[in-house]
């Protein structure tokens, strides 16, 4: 796996799924391919994106700044600085300085990542802030190691929280989660269907599923009534894709 592929993988792992994630993935690909070369326009776009947490925006802003060539005196962005200040905690700043000194001795991406993984997310963010504010310099490779370590920690905590939701025994939460997943799957089917003749069938299945979820929410139904809803939808989607000659078996 190339360095930039690895960075893209880690950064996207902390972005919530949805159309915005696809948009960010495209921007990252363009930036890494040297296509998107106006840093100011890119940062303005990032600043106004909804849904993303300030820290995620800060990390993305840091990655864009590392990758897109810019004029020497280009102003640093406040929204990135605020996100990478370790919540203003002096302990985070102290640890960030210690980490920075260790990173100065590293020359490889993996070496930097290993060193960084033993620090808290707050200290890692503060260390990124030091580098972003030009208070310290490291090689791009080392900076990317720091980024990936931070993303790994965030993704770990997101995974724990997601696992808690998936394994919850509360039937109401499970019921709602199944309906949300069915609804988003239906939306994806509608987007993928396009305008071919066979698309009408997929659109019909998706539309019925969304109507069913809407009705279930409106009248209130037994928590077990949503069981299998998303799986049925996915089977329909896969059958449709097979007829279209597309193989995407890994949706479930």
Curated annotation (Swiss-Prot):
Organism the protein comes from: Influenza A virus (strain A/Chicken/Pennsylvania/1370/1983 H5N2)
Record-stated family: Belongs to the influenza viruses Matrix protein M1 family.
The protein's name: Matrix protein 1
Subcellular location: Virion membrane; Host nucleus
Disulfide bond residue pairs: none
Cross-referenced InterPro entries: Flu_matrix_M1, Flu_matrix_M1_C, Flu_matrix_M1_N, Flu_matrix_M1_N_sub1, Flu_matrix_M1_N_sub2, INFV_M1
Membrane spanning residue stretches: none
Motif extent (Nuclear localization signal): 101-105
The protein's assembly and partners: Homodimer and homomultimer. Interacts with NEP. Binds ribonucleocapsid by both interacting with genomic RNA and NP protein. May interact with HA and NA. Cannot bind NP without genomic RNA.
Any one annotated GO CC term: membrane
């Amino acid at each position: 796996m190339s360095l930039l592929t690895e960075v893209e993988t880690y950064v996207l792992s902390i972005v919530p799924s949805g159309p915005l994630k696809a948009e960010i993935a495209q921007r990252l690909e363009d930036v890494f391919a040297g296509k998107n070369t106006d840093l100011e326009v890119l940062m303005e776009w990032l600043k106004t994106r909804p849904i993303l947490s300030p820290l995620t925006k800060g990390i993305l802003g840091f990655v864009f700044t590392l990758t897109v060539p810019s004029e020497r005196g280009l102003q640093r962005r406040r929204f990135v600085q605020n996100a990478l200040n370790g919540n203003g905690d002096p302990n985070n700043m102290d640890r960030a300085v210690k980490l920075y000194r260790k990173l100065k001795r590293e020359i490889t991406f993996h070496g930097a990542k290993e060193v960084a993984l033993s620090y808290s997310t707050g200290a890692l963010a503060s260390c990124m802030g030091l580098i972003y504010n030009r208070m310290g310099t490291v090689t791009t490779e080392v900076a990317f190691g720091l980024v990936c370590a931070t993303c790994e920690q965030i993704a770990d905590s997101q995974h724990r929280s997601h696992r808690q939701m998936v394994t919850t025994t509360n039937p109401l939460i499970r019921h709602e989660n199944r309906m949300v997943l069915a609804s988003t799957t239906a939306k994806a089917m509608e987007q993928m269907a396009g305008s071919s003749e066979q698309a009408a069938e997929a659109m019909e299945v998706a539309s019925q599923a969304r109507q069913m979820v809407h009705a279930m929410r409106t009248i209130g139904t037994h928590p077990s009534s949503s069981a299998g809803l998303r799986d049925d939808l996915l089977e329909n989607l896969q059958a449709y894709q097979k007829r279209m000659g597309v193989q995407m078996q890994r949706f479930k």
